[in-house]
Amino acid sequence: MNTINASMTVIGAGSYGTALAITLARNGHHVVLWGHDPAHIATLQADRCNAAFLPDVPFPDTLHLESDLATALAASRNILVVVPSHVFGQVLRQIKPLMRPDARVVWATKGLEAETGRLLQDVAREALGDEIPLAVISGPTFAKELAAGLPTAISLAATDETFADDLQQLLHCGKSFRVYSNPDFIGVQLGGAVKNVIAIGAGMSDGIGFGANARTALITRGLAEMSRLGAALGADPTTFMGMAGLGDLVLTCTDNQSRNRRFGMMLGQGADVQSAQEKIGQVVEGYRNTKEVRELAARVGVEMPITEEIYQVLYCGKNAREAALTLLGRTRKDERSSQ
């Protein structure tokens, strides 16, 4: 392959990165998929599928595997980063000196920066500088369904209108993958972080056995927390009624493909945090996101009671049922209250 002609380089060969690479390649684009483990990339190349996570989806011929980072980054000006949020900044600093001069960076990572709670746009600007166009994609996307070509829709926000148009054209597929543009760069990022937290809470509720009424109440009040935090950060409230907000929230709170939901269910059934994480076997983004979202909310003065109680369970040893009863026992409020 003449790597100069690749439409996209995907950084991160986990389940979601692989699914996005497959989707792009299925659209007829040459795509390079890079992973940090050469042995893993060699296995993907030999199997021509991601047998660990997406065993029934063969790679299109236009999907190319690469273990050398410099070669992968030379392949395309468009770089899609799909790595866990706690290594996001580290990965950007790693790729910065190897990127092409005309590089543009989009990420599908959902979350905030570990320890600081900063938005990923701030991490990206610090790592990459002010000149590189940035974009984010987010929405209700389980990797298995996306890779299988089942109908999916997401939101896309970018700092550069041309980049947004180009990405929408690259990703959009009328048969299965609908991409909605959205100018709200902050809101599209924030929804993906907060929904991870609320999904843990919904899982806890179901694990305890509280039923559909309680789950729906958590989703609805979780959306209110998301919207309040977004408003404090300057996001457009309508964004949270779209794919990156309500769409992703409903998906991850109601389907057991969600690692965050399954993690919460185990906690609700009495498992401790460590054993629940070990049973999941993959990164549970909501675990770190809970701490980060809580810190961000405190910094901007937004009350998020659901997030607070989930934090108490994850980091302070509080029992999940006790946390739920604390929420139920809060003083009466107007539904439209800012608290």
From Swiss-Prot:
Pfam families in UniProt: NAD_Gly3P_dh_C, NAD_Gly3P_dh_N
Substrates-to-products reaction catalysed: sn-glycerol 3-phosphate + NAD(+) = dihydroxyacetone phosphate + NADH + H(+); sn-glycerol 3-phosphate + NADP(+) = dihydroxyacetone phosphate + NADPH + H(+)
Alphabetized GO MF terms: glycerol-3-phosphate dehydrogenase [NAD(P)+] activity; NAD binding
Record keywords, A-Z: Cytoplasm, Lipid biosynthesis, Lipid metabolism, NAD, NADP, Nucleotide-binding, Oxidoreductase, Phospholipid biosynthesis, Phospholipid metabolism
Cellular compartment(s): Cytoplasm
Keyword rRNA processing found: no
Active site as annotated: 195
Entry's Gene Ontology BP terms: carbohydrate metabolic process; glycerol-3-phosphate biosynthetic process; glycerol-3-phosphate catabolic process; glycerophospholipid biosynthetic process
Known function: Catalyzes the reduction of the glycolytic intermediate dihydroxyacetone phosphate (DHAP) to sn-glycerol 3-phosphate (G3P), the key precursor for phospholipid synthesis.
Family the UniProt entry places it in: Belongs to the NAD-dependent glycerol-3-phosphate dehydrogenase family.
NCBIfam families listed in its UniProt record: PRK00094.1-1 (NF000939), PRK00094.1-2 (NF000940), PRK00094.1-4 (NF000942)
Protein's UniProt name: Glycerol-3-phosphate dehydrogenase [NAD(P)+]
Organism: Cronobacter sakazakii (strain ATCC BAA-894)
